[in-house]
A protein has these predicted regions:
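Basic, low-complexity segments
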Residues: 1-45
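Helix-centered, glycine/charged polyanion-binding patches within enzymatic domains
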Residues: 2-10, 196-269, 275-276
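C-terminal domain-tail junction helix/linker
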Residues: 6-8, 14-22, 276-308
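Residues that form generic nucleotide/phosphate-binding pockets
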Residues: 20, 99, 106, 179, ...
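Polybasic low-complexity intrinsically disordered regions
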Residues: 40-57, 61, 65-71, 75, ...
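Short, solvent-exposed helix-loop connector elements
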Residues: 44, 137-140, 243-256, 269-287, ...
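Inter-helical turn/loop segments and adjacent helix faces that build the functional surface
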Residues: 83
Length: 308
């Protein structure tokens, strides 16, 4: 029996996508001349901050984008503002280090008409320990530590809508409800696609509470509880057993989950490890990476169709 020929795909918007890729290399797409660079005076006791959160996030975005230490980041900011013709003061490396611990980085996203279809997955990212080649060649010389990044992506726009940053030992089940809580209540969620690690009562209950449909691979037996989450899961499990898992994946579009796995590669393209060593700066660094990825998506993405 001969194997079927592999599918062939074609990019339909190559001209605009090529222009978007060129724009990603421009430094000025990150600089908004209308941003509030200096922090407003709030009238509180103590010394007020000099720079706004937007200014600190912009400086740290340049740091993450070019993988620079803090001192080199401050020097590059001086050159960048001089090129733009802006006479703005630049925070030093000590200010960037302290403000990163308390920064709540903001990342923009695009909203589309209709229900929101979420793709959920997680990956590990290293912040301490030897590199892979050094560990394989010479052995592990010190303890290697990881953190876990949980993402929820919009299937229509490929923008990251929610992110959580946890220790490496934490599982996916407690985090899925927290990801759904980051979606505004007035925004309708259509489906939530995740792997079998989220096949838990807590996850199904959180999805049903948002009036969404769970597309999660089922690995266990039927639940005996009589609740909306259990009934929806049991019906899917019966359909999987009757028609087969391959048909269920095609019917529900479960294979779209591979797109969130590809987005993990985009996240690690900005660095296989995170530079910060403390949890709060690490969270800010991951959020800044998400902001960079969403900004790249806003410039333009490839539209690929199957031709054969």
């Amino acid at each position: 029996m001969t194997k079927p020929s592999p599918a062939r795909y074609r990019t339909t918007n190559w001209f605009s996508y090529n222009a978007a890729l060129r724009k990603r290399g421009s430094l000025l797409i990150w600089l908004d001349r209308a941003m509030s660079w200096l922090a407003p005076h709030e009238g509180r006791l103590g010394r007020p901050p000099v720079f706004s959160d937007a200014a600190i996030q912009f400086c740290l975005s340049i740091k993450v984008l070019f993988r620079l230490p803090l001192r080199q980041t401050a020097g590059m900011m001086v050159s960048l503002l001089r090129m733009a013709g802006l006479d703005w003061p630049v925070p030093d490396y000590s200010t960037l280090c302290h403000r990163q611990k308390t920064l709540a980085a903001q990342f923009l996203y695009r909203r589309v008409d209709g229900p929101l279809n979420l793709l959920v997955d997680s990956t590990g990212i290293k912040f301490l320990g030897n590199d892979e080649w050094q560990a394989r060649k010479h052995g592990v010389q010190r303890r290697r530590q990881w953190r876990k990044v949980h993402l929820a992506m919009d299937a229509a726009t490929s923008d990251i809508r929610a992110v959580e940053f946890t220790p490496g030992r934490d599982g996916d089940r407690p985090i899925l409800p927290e990801l759904l809580d980051q979606i505004p209540e007035d925004e309708e969620i259509g489906t939530v696609t995740a792997d079998g690690a989220c096949d838990a009562r807590r996850c199904h209950s959180a999805i049903i509470a948002r009036r969404a449909t769970a597309i999660i691979r089922r690995n266990g037996r039927l639940w005996k509880e009589d609740c909306p989450a259990a009934r929806a899961r049991n019906e899917t499990l019966r359909a999987t057993r009757h028609y087969g898992r391959a048909f269920w994946k095609r019917w529900t579009g479960y294979h779209a989950r591979s797109r969130i796995e590809a987005k993990m590669l985009c996240l690690k393209a900005l660095g296989e490890r995170i530079a910060a060593k403390d949890p709060d700066p690490q969270t800010a660094e991951i959020q800044i990476r998400i902001a960079l990825i969403n900004r790249f998506n806003a410039l333009g993405t490839a539209e690929i169709v199957r031709v054969a």
